[in-house]
A protein has these predicted regions:
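A conserved acidic beta->alpha catalytic loop
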Residues: 57-66, 112
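Acceptor/aglycone-binding surface of glycosyltransferases and processive sugar-polymer synthases
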Residues: 81-99, 104, 116-198, 224-234, ...
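N-proximal low-complexity "stem/linker" segments adjacent to membrane-targeting elements
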Residues: 1-44
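Hydrophobic helical membrane-anchoring modules
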Residues: 1-19, 168, 192-275, 301-331, ...
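Donor nucleotide-sugar binding loop of glycosyltransferases
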Residues: 31-34, 60, 115
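Cell-envelope/extracellular polymer assembly enzymes that use nucleotide-activated donors
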Residues: 21-23, 52, 203
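Conserved donor nucleotide-binding strand/loop of the catalytic core
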Residues: 51-54, 65-99
Length: 379
């Protein structure tokens, strides 16, 4: 995956009694309340094994990274990677996995909702069988989802069914964030992974050029007792963006597709408002066009802010400033649209439909590029 950094280490590959067996990667954000408990629980589960715990923190404002460093000063098996300006579980896991010399790497949440006691069984399977991945599944017999509400269970089951149908992945729990993988395979696939959102397991299975050999073990998803949940509508949007990225990301960015869909909806909004103001309310055409443009522009901005750039969402005064930035970029894009289309039709004698499409494409590309840089720039 582009732009990923890694703390590269070297380790004797000879499998002796002192060889590093396993790395546990723990992506965190605001998990200071649970991090001590998690480290102790993993250590108890892996007693007798040679392992390291790599905690990858997305610059948590609650001081999670500082707490991890305090733990690491007393225990050399614990390491901290603090990421600045980058967010997301998938990217954090990839960076952590690339930072270890262990032949096998696992990912586990920092909130104690995954069952760390399953780790030895997962490790044994990978060490004794010709498999590449072992997945902790909530949907096998003896597994479970804890105290989830009926609505959340329904959404999860629907997402699982859609994923299996669309991607062909046969996992019982493709949304699982608890699994173990051979490091060599992860390093081989890393440059092609999207690194979007939470669903790194699904990303791996879609990206792999051949069918992954895997096993699944049941576990019961625990109720969160420490910290606050990160699950919200963003997770669903990340899921959609991941599927789009895997489907068309080699041609155009997934965000460009969403941006274009929003723009198409904007055309519908524009025509609706124009019809309402001009035809129904009896205002002149120019007034109707101005009203329709302002409403459609605001609609596009709001939808892009909520959907396309859910990971950089603006609020408060930044929303207002963003609207002005978006409106300016869109106005210039509209001028470019009209100018290109008119030139092609009038000067180059290009058919009117092709001229119009070319103008629209120029406008959309301009709007997407400029607003991504200035309106929703990464901070």
């Amino acid at each position: 995956m582009k732009g990923m950094s890694a703390l590269c280490t070297h380790h004797d590959a000879e499998l002796d009694a002192d060889a590093l067996e396993l790395a546990i990667v723990v992506p965190t954000f605001n998990e200071i309340e649970s991090i001590d408990v998690l480290v102790s629980a993993v250590q108890a589960a892996l007693e007798g094994h040679n392992y390291e715990i790599i905690i990858v923190d997305d610059d948590s404002p609650d001081g999670t990274a500082d707490r991890v460093r305090e733990i690491a000063r007393r225990d050399r098996r614990v390491h901290c990677i603090q990421r600045i300006g980058r967010r997301g579980l998938s990217g954090a896991f990839i960076e952590g996995a690339l930072a270890t010399a262990a032949p096998i790497v696992a990912v586990i949440d920092g909130d104690m909702q995954h069952d760390e006691m399953l780790l030895p069984a997962m490790l044994k399977i990978l060490r004794t069988r010709d498999l590449e991945v072992v997945v902790g599944s909530r949907y096998l017999e003896k597994g479970g989802v804890g105290n989830w509400t009926g609505g959340r269970i329904l959404v999860s089951q629907l997402a699982t069914a859609v994923t299996r149908r669309v991607t062909g992945v046969t996992l019982s729990d493709p949304m699982s964030g608890f699994f173990m993988i051979r490091s060599e395979m992860l390093r081989r696939l890393a440059p092609q992974l999207s690194g979007i959102g939470f669903k790194i397991l699904l990303d791996l299975f879609i990206t792999a050029p051949s069918v992954i050999r895997f096993a699944e073990l049941p576990y019961r998803f625990r109720a969160r007792s420490l910290g606050t949940s990160k699950m919200d509508a963003k997770v669903a949007l990340e899921f959609v963006e991941l599927l789009l990225d895997k489907a068309v990301g080699h041609i155009v960015p997934a965000k460009f597709v969403i941006f274009s869909v929003v723009g198409t909806l904007g055309v519908v909004v524009h025509l609706f408002v124009l019809t309402l103001v001009f035809k129904e309310w009896g205002f002149d055409f120019e007034s109707g066009q101005i009203a329709a443009t302002l409403v459609a522009m605001t609609s596009n901005f709001a939808l892009n802010n909520a959907l396309t750039y859910y990971d950089r969402r603006l609020s408060g005064w930044r929303w207002i400033n963003g609207w002005f930035s978006f409106a300016l970029a869109s106005s210039i894009g509209a001028i470019a649209n009209v100018g290109i289309a008119t030139y092609l039709f009038s000067v180059q004698e290009t058919p009117w439909l092709l001229s119009a499409v070319a103008g629209v494409l120029v406008g959309v590309v301009w709007n997407y590029t400029v607003t991504a840089i200035f309106t929703w720039r990464r901070t």
